[in-house]
Regions:
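A structural "hinge/loop" feature
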Residues: 37-53, 77, 104-108, 173-183, ...
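Gly/Pro-rich hinge or "lid" segments in bacterial periplasmic/extracellular proteins
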Residues: 67-68, 149, 159-160, 169-236, ...
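Structural transition elements
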Residues: 212, 303, 332-365, 382-390
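Detector for C-terminal structural segments
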Residues: 28-34, 51-54, 171, 218-221, ...
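Surface-exposed binding/hinge segments that line
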Residues: 93, 125-126, 130-190
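Ligand-site clamp/hinge motif
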Residues: 200-203, 228-274, 392
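N-terminal lobe/hinge region of extracytoplasmic solute-binding protein
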Residues: 33-85, 122, 129, 207-209
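Aromatic- and charge-enriched surface segment that lines or borders ligand/interaction sites
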Residues: 79-130, 163, 255, 302
Length: 534
């Protein structure tokens, strides 16, 4: 009898071992060669594409989300919603049975509900909220939309219903809720970490309802995500998602060619022909809803002078930059809105390249003998700027022709963003990819007074006539009126020149042939839930 039991036990152990080995062998892993390290894992606080790709996209959901690869909004954590006749009350009916992830610090005891929605927004809205100041508490997207003023209350009707009351109708409100700062965090996890005395863990060890959970992060090296088996839309096709942090585009390509990673962002334009010739690579592309620009700090001399800003704009040989830096992957920009965004004013006339006129303007501004300026260049490739260092050097050479001495400055990406937000720069290469497709998502975060203090307004431009236009457009339900107001805003920006609009680019993404289901995101994010790999 003992022998029989032992034999059965041994056979069972062998079967379990075989199954374990089999599952290990068949586990599907996709490696994404990302361009940089996230600042942290809370998209309410850190909004760069690099941070959002590592937080909002894999870990979290929102009440509404965009259909992958499109600009079409669809229900997500909210199954449906009702809007009052006066346009000021939104009632969201929440999806039932949605599970939160867990980690070594926390195991959820309940499903997603209205408390999580209220926590996620009130943390950003209420200065007295216990989490408001955690992790430095800078909610630039929330504040740039003036959501603190717009939302008068968020009420729990019941566990599966939440009501937002607004001070006035807001045309892009639903679209804004699909923006990544509106990701839904776990209130229960937050309460647990607050009691443990480690509230910042919520932002560094995230727990969401999304398709992947964060398993490991080695700064500047690697991020490991594992598929969340209880994801409400069904488990992802891949088991592991690895971000191999690789700042150099040439190194990213070398890894892709050796199948050390299967997807890479922001290729060097010069490498595109090589990728097209490689039978193992599928070079995907889509028109990007983005704009690369040079922001002038309008609160610092000498760029606080509009004539100086206009002169510096006229001195930039934009066509030469498009040819040398973008190499066929970009078109010259003359206003903030790219052609794919409604109300973009194609009739607006760009500043001509005119060094002599620029010199005359500098003289009028009191700088007949020229001036010295710092010119900041971002250290990473972005969808709207494949080579900021090269672009800065070309602008530096252009400005030298009108007597302007520019010193090119750069920092590590997180430090660069931090310093630009605090206004240390005079002129900085920046850019934007819309998160919603609405014109307000360009004007509001980037150039309104509200976003000038610690927000995404890198020009630190606060111009009341412009602010009034944007507010009027945002609160109007008349589409044609909004179009007219946004066109007026584009002309006003052209005249005041808080930033030189340089380029709109096409997004190119090389993907290994082993990968299926990948879609280029028009908003510039990298989404892997729907992806499979052989």
């Amino acid at each position: 009898m003992k022998t029989s039991i032992t034999t059965k036990t041994t056979k069972l152990a062998l079967i379990i071992a075989a199954l374990t080995v089999s599952s290990t062998v068949t586990a599907k892993t996709l490696v994404y060669c990302s361009e940089g390290s996230p600042e942290n894992f809370n998209p309410q606080l850190y909004t760069s594409g690099t941070s959002v790709d590592a937080s909002a996209v894999p870990v979290y959901n929102r009440l509404v989300d965009f259909k992958v690869g499109t600009t079409d909004l669809q229900p997500s954590l909210a199954e449906s919603w009702d809007v009052s006749e006066d346009g000021k009350v939104y009632t969201f009916h929440l999806r039932k049975g949605v599970k939160f992830q867990s980690n070594k610090y926390f195991k959820p005891s309940r499903d997603f509900n209205a408390d999580d929605v209220i926590f996620s927004f009130m943390r950003q809205k209420d200065p007295k909220h216990p989490y408001h100041n955690v992790s430095n508490g800078n909610y630039s997207n929330f504040e740039s939309l003036e959501f603190g003023k717009l939302i008068t209350s968020i009420d729990k009707v019941d566990d599966n219903t939440v009501r937002f009351t607004l001070t006035h109708p807001e045309a892009p409100f639903i679209a804004d809720l699909g923006w990544y700062f509106a990701s839904i965090l776990s209130a229960e996890y937050a309460d647990s970490m607050l009691k443990a005395g480690t509230p910042e863990r919520v932002d560094m060890d995230p727990i969401g309802t999304g398709p992947f959970r964060l398993a490991q992060y080695q700064k500047d090296s690697r991020i490991l995500f594992t598929a969340f088996p209880e994801y409400w839309q069904g488990k992802a096709k891949i088991d592991k998602l690895v971000f191999s942090i690789t700042p150099d585009a040439s190194v990213r390509l070398a890894k892709l060619e050796k199948n050390e990673c299967q997807v890479m962002p922001f290729p060097n334009p010069a490498d595109l022909p090589r990728m097209k010739e490689n039978a193992d690579i599928n070079l995907m592309q889509k028109a990007g809803l983005n704009t690369g620009f040079l922001a002038f700090n309008t609160q610092k001399a000498p760029t606080d002078n509009v004539k100086v800003r206009q002169a510096l704009a006229m001195a930039i040989n934009k066509p030469a930059i498009i040819d040398a830096v973008f190499r066929g992957t970009g078109t010259a920009a003359k206003n903030l809105l790219p052609p794919g965004v409604w109300s973009a004013d194609d009739s607006l006339k760009d500043y001509e390249y005119a060094p002599e006129k620029a010199k005359a303007l500098l003289t009028e501004a009191g700088f007949a003998n020229g001036l010295t300026i710092d010119l900041w260049a971002m250290p990473v490739q972005r969808p709207y700027n494949p080579n900021a260092k090269r672009m800065a050097e070309m602008i530096q050479a252009d400005w030298a022709k009108i007597g302007v001495t520019a010193k090119v400055v750069t920092f590590e990406w997180g430090e660069y963003l931090k310093r630009v937000k605090s206004g240390e720069h005079q002129a900085a290469l920046m850019g934007w990819t819309t998160a919603t497709g609405d014109p307000d998502n360009f004007f509001g975060p980037l150039f309104t007074c509200r976003s000038a203090d610690g927000g995404s307004n890198s020009a630190k431009w606060c111009y009341q006539p412009f602010d009034k236009l944007i507010l009027e457009a945002r609160t109007s339900s008349d589409h044609e009126k909004r179009v007219a107001l946004y066109k007026e805003a584009q002309q006003m920006m052209h005249d005041q020149m808080p930033a030189v609009m340089i380029a709109h680019s096409t997004i190119f993404e090389p993907v290994r042939k082993e990968v299926s289901g990948y879609e280029v995101d028009p908003f510039g994010k990298h989404i892997f839930y729907q992806v499979d790999v052989k």
